[in-house]
Amino acid sequence: MADKQISLPAKLINGGIAGLIGVTCVFPIDLAKTRLQNQQNGQRMYASMSDCLIKTIRSEGYFGMYRGAAVNLTLVTPEKAIKLAANDFFRHQLSKDGQKLTLPKEMLAGCGAGTCQVIVTTPMEMLKIQLQDAGRIAAQRKMLAAQAQLATQGGGQPSVEAPAAPRPTATQLTRDLLRNHGIAGLYKGLGATLLRDVPFSIVYFPLFANLNQLGRPSSEEKSPFYVSFLAGCVAGSAAAVAVNPCDVVKTRLQSLERGVNEDTYSGFLDCARKIWRHEGPSAFLKGAYCRALVIAPLFGIAQVVYFLGIAESLLGLLQEPQA
């Protein structure tokens, strides 16, 4: 069966709707992932995802779990739209007379989609990580200040709390990065983002397409929406875990603020080498469980919205009065 002609506006709208719904549902888990990945040996603020979320609520309130969400909600629409539309475009260009794509061509289409999306993904992740990790650094400094005060007072209760550091905002961060580093400041970690997102797309899109094909009743029908959802969840979580080592390195490289006694890095290889040497190979899987929990529903929801054709329906309603 020939693929239907791509409607770019519809694909962009579908990707945007899916991104907004998905981010709203899973952002607290993404915050826990960032904070767990940024923990280096020594001071460990959080033992697990649940411990991180509980401590975040206690110290920063419920909305502390959504710190940095505004950046994601603003930029996830173009990011997801570019990713899904680019994959559709490349699949359409690589197909011949509607024939099923071979695996190498599916991987090539995914590679193209992953490369296109980093235009938006890199600055979005750069800003989001600073906002998400600010609470961890503030809590660590407060704890260390309290411990130091206890030591000087001989075990008595601390009489004065450490002054709270002002919370950064996305606007302040953007202004500072542009003023001090130019546009390159927003694209710090671009190489690491490419090394994460291109392999992710190479794994995700072919795996999703084949899993979704398995649940299709016949070659002339679409897969049921629940099949698309499950295929998106399975493919998303598998791809997320596969590229988690690159995500750990990317998160460390894009973090501007460091906690006490935490390493600094000069580049991707330097970061990977120091993580291996100081924390062991298991450190590359930090946050993998959280990342799978984030990506699975995010891409499951995305594919359901995409395959239900919500945007096509909306655009059709808008065009009806003109008919």
Curated annotation (Swiss-Prot):
What does the record give under GO molecular function? amino acid:proton symporter activity; L-aspartate transmembrane transporter activity; L-glutamate transmembrane transporter activity
A biological process from GO:
regulation of insulin secretion
Question: Is Disulfide bond among this UniProt entry's keywords?
Answer: no
Topological type in the membrane: Multi-pass membrane protein
Q: Does the keyword Cell membrane apply?
A: no
Q: Which UniProt keywords apply?
A: Membrane, Mitochondrion, Mitochondrion inner membrane, Repeat, Transmembrane, Transmembrane helix, Transport
For this record, an example GO cellular component is:
mitochondrial inner membrane
Catalysed reaction, written as an equation: L-glutamate(in) + H(+)(in) = L-glutamate(out) + H(+)(out)
Gene3D superfamilies in the record:
Mitochondrial carrier domain
Question: Which residue spans traverse the membrane?
Answer: 12-32, 62-82, 107-127, 189-209, 223-243, 292-312
Domain of life the protein comes from? Eukaryota
Q: Where in the cell is it found?
A: Mitochondrion inner membrane
Q: Which residues form a coiled coil?
A: none
Q: Where are the Solcar repeats?
A: 6-93, 101-214, 223-312
PANTHER family annotated for this entry? MITOCHONDRIAL 2-OXODICARBOXYLATE CARRIER 1-RELATED, MITOCHONDRIAL GLUTAMATE CARRIER 1
* Sequence similarity: Belongs to the mitochondrial carrier (TC 2.A.29) family.
Put simply, this protein is called Mitochondrial glutamate carrier 1
Species name for this entry?
Answer: Rattus norvegicus
Lineage of the species this protein comes from: Eukaryota, Metazoa, Chordata, Craniata, Vertebrata
